[in-house]
Amino acid sequence: MVSLLRCQSSKPYSSLICSLALGVAFALSGTAYAEETKPTETVPAPVVTPPKVTPPPATKNQVRFTKTGAFDSDYVVKLARKLAAKPYSVLKDPLPVGLAKLTYDEYRDIRFNPTASIWRDQGLPFQMQMFHRGFYFQDLIEIAIVEGNKATHLAYEPKYFTAGEVITQALPNDDIGYSGFRIHNQLNNNGVFDELMVFQGASYFRALGKGNAYGLSARGLALKTADPEGEEFPIFRAFWVERPHYDSNLIVVHALLDSPSVAGAYRFSVRPGDNTQIDVEATLFPRVELSKVGLAPSTSMFLHSLNGRHDTDDFRPEVHDSDGLLMFNGRGEHLWRPLANPRQLQVSAFSDNSPQGFGLIQRERSYAAYQDLEAQYERRPSLWIEPVGNWGQGAVVLTEIPTESEIHDNIVSFWKPRQPIPAGSEYHFAYRMSWGEEPAVKHNYVVVSRTASGRADIAKPTPRRLFVVDYQVNGAMPEELPLAKVEASGGIISNVVIAPNAANNGYRLAFELEPEGKELIELRAELKFPTPRQVETWLYRWTL
C-alpha cells in the first residue's frame, strides 16, 4: 500500500494514523528493477528547454557509527550499550533545503541507478540499492558493508542515483548519507533480481515471499502505541550488511536502534523463499523503564470486508492488507480474530504465557474477493511471528484505528511483556518471521475461512446483528456435526445454527446478537467434535 498521508483530519486519533504511516517505506519502483525502456515515439517530440539546475550548498556530516574498521558479532551490541549509557541526543545532520522540501513527485524522480547496485558484477545471490534522503525521509542513516572481520563505510555518492526529469536541483557531492536501502534477490525468476526486503523510515522494514506484492510492514520496536501522550518511534540509525557468500541463500543485516527511551542491537538473518524467513535477535538497553513496549510489532491496513463495511461506498467487496490476527497460545489453542475498522479507537489484549506464535494474516487469497486489478490485495503477504525461547507472561496486543482511506495503516499488533523492562538492564529476545503464506494447516485441522455480518431483521433496521462464520476442514469431513458454543460478554445470543457447507468442505455457523444497548461486546465461538481435533476458536469484538 502507498503510505502517503493527507494528515489533515481533526479527529483525535488522526495523529496516530499519520505517525504510523509516515514511517512506512515507500515502494518507489516495481518489484523487478529491470532498466526502463521508453516506447518508440510515432510523432516528433516537442522541443523542451531543460530546467535550470541549481547547485546545492555544501553539506558537512560526520560518520558516527559505521566507521571503516574491525567488526565482529558483538560490535553493534557494544555500540548500543555505550549509546544507552549516555542521555539521548537528537542528531542534527544537515540536509540541503531543496532536498528537505521535495514534493512526492520530486522525490520519486531520484532513482537508484540499477547498474550501480552493490555486488551487481560479483555473481552473488543478493544485490543492494540505497534510498536517497529527502521528502519525509530526512534522517541520515549510515550503512557499512561487512566482509570478513572488516566493516567499510558506504559513503554517499551522487553517481549512484539518476534524477532530472522533475527535480530542478543537482544532487549533493558531499556525504549526506542515505535514508535506507533495499535488498534484491532472484526471488521469483532466475536472472531477474526482484525486491526482497526494504529498510526505510524509523525502524520500519518489510519483506516479500515468492509471488507477493508489498503490503504490511514490521518495526524493530513499538513504544507507547495508542498512548494519549503520543507514540515514540525508535529509529535504526545505522546498518552493517554482511557480504553474502556465492553459494548461500542467506544475507545478514545488523542494525543499531535508538530513541529517547532505549537503544538496541538487532541482527536479521534473511532467507528468501516461498515464505521468506527472517530470524531476529535483539538486545535492548533501556534508558528508562519500558512499561509500554511492544516486541515484534507489525503494522497493516484494514478498510472493509464482509464482516463490517460501515456504509462504505466502494466497488470492491474487500480492501485490506491483512484480514485477521492468528494466535497459537501457550495453552495449545488456535485463535482467529477477524480485523475491523471501528468507529472509535480499539485496543484488545489477549493474555498468554509462553506464546507459540502470532501474526497478521491475509487469509483471503482470491481475486474475486477484492476485484482490484492494481492493488492486488490477494498477493499481500502474511507475517507470522514465532518466538524463540520462552517469552513468559504477557499479551498479544491488537490496536485498530478508524480510517476512511486505504492509504492509512490503521492496524498494529505486537507482544507486550507483563513486567516492565527496567532502566539500565539488558533485555534479550529472539523470534522468527515468515513473510508469505500463513502457517501450514495440518491434516484434519478446522480453520475459519470467512466471517460476515449484517442486520438480522429483514423487515426493518434494528440493532440486532446476524453473524455468519464459515469453517473449512483440511481433510475428510467428519461423519457427525460438531456442537457450536457461542458466548458473549453482553447482550443476548440466539438462533445458533451449525450446518454442513459443501461449498468449502466445512461448516457454517450462524447466530444472532441482540446488543441490548451495549456499545462493545466480546464474542467467542467454538466447535466441539465427538472425536477431538484441532479447531480454531473464533473471537470478535463487536462495536457500534
From Swiss-Prot:
Annotated keywords: Periplasm, Signal
Pathway: Glycan metabolism; osmoregulated periplasmic glucan (OPG) biosynthesis
Keyword field contains Repeat: no
Signal peptide positions on this chain: 1-34
Pfam families membership: MdoG
Coiled-coil regions, chain positions: none
GO molecular function, one term: catalytic activity
Gene Ontology cellular-component terms listed: outer membrane-bounded periplasmic space
Family matches, as Gene3D superfamilies: 2.70.98.10, Immunoglobulins
Subcellular location: Periplasm
GO process annotations (BP): beta-glucan biosynthetic process
Matches recorded under InterPro entries: Gal_mutarotase_sf_dom, GH-type_carb-bd, Glucan_biosyn_MdoG/MdoD, Glucan_biosyn_MdoG_C, Ig-like_fold, Ig_E-set, MdoG_OpgG
Stated family: Belongs to the OpgD/OpgG family.
Functional summary from the UniProt entry: Involved in the biosynthesis of osmoregulated periplasmic glucans (OPGs).
UniProt xrefs under PANTHER family: GLUCANS BIOSYNTHESIS PROTEIN, GLUCANS BIOSYNTHESIS PROTEIN G
Protein name as catalogued: Glucans biosynthesis protein G
UniProt source species: Shewanella sp. (strain W3-18-1)
Record gene name: opgG
